[in-house]
């Protein structure tokens, strides 16, 4: 996954994959098929890891607003410093391949829908607890948060300070809660 993350799909050559996996050409093809199949497996793992993290952050074991704050703080952490400069495999892949590769487009679209659903669930729990501001609809707020965090991943490549990113995340969430 790291090679694709660092170089992108088109920038990754077979020798890069052989070095990273420590497999021979024949073993790599036997294990994964081809470069595209290996890339899709790497992308699937990245997505699964992100969704599992969201399940922990936004799950019912946390108060909804606390979970939302934890979720946003996690994104701020991942978009700050060297992590921010590295960027997001999903965003980079969307920019590089989503318009040309149906398999990739479907996976990324599915991820964004799943993220939106998890956020809408937490926001619905907050609404039921009387913690959402008047007029805030969970589904709309969830879409806004998805756009915000993915935009934060892009802006993170330019090196904003963690303090600035966290203040922006807090200001946005504060618009949604009481």
What are these regions (language model features)?
Residues 67-68, 82-103:
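Amphipathic alpha-helical segments used for helix-helix packing
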Residues 45, 56, 103-114, 118-121:
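Short, solvent-exposed amphipathic helices
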Residues 65-66, 106-111, 128-144, 163-164:
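All-alpha amphipathic helical-bundle segments outside canonical DNA-binding/catalytic cores
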Residues 86, 91, 136-155, 168-175:
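Hydrophobic alpha-helical segments that form the core
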Residues 44-50:
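Short, basic, alpha-helical segments at the C-terminal edge of helix-turn-helix-like DNA-binding modules
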Residues 41, 55-86, 138-145:
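Hydrophobic alpha-helical connector segments
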Residues 70-78, 113-129, 148, 158-178:
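C-terminal peripheral helix-coil segments that are non-catalytic and often amphipathic
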Residues 3-37, 41:
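Helix-turn-helix
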């Amino acid at each position: 996954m790291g090679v694709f993350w660092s170089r992108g799909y088109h920038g990754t050559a077979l020798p890069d994959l052989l070095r990273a996996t420590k497999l021979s050409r024949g073993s790599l093809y036997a294990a994964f098929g081809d470069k595209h199949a290996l890339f899709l497996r790497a992308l699937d793992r990245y997505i699964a890891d992100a969704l599992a993290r969201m399940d922990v952050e936004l799950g019912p074991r946390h108060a909804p607003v606390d979970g939302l704050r934890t979720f946003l703080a996690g994104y701020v952490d991942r978009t700050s410093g060297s992590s921010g400069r590295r960027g997001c495999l999903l965003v980079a892949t969307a920019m590089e391949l989503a318009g040309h590769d149906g398999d990739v487009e479907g996976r990324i679209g599915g991820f964004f829908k799943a993220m939106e659903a998890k956020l809408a669930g937490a926001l619905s729990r907050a609404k039921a607890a009387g913690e959402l501001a008047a007029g805030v609809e969970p589904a709309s707020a969830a879409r806004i948060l998805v756009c915000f965090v993915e935009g934060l991943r892009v802006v993170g490549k330019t090196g904003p300070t963690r303090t600035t990113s966290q203040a922006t995340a807090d200001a946005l969430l504060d618009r949604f809660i009481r």
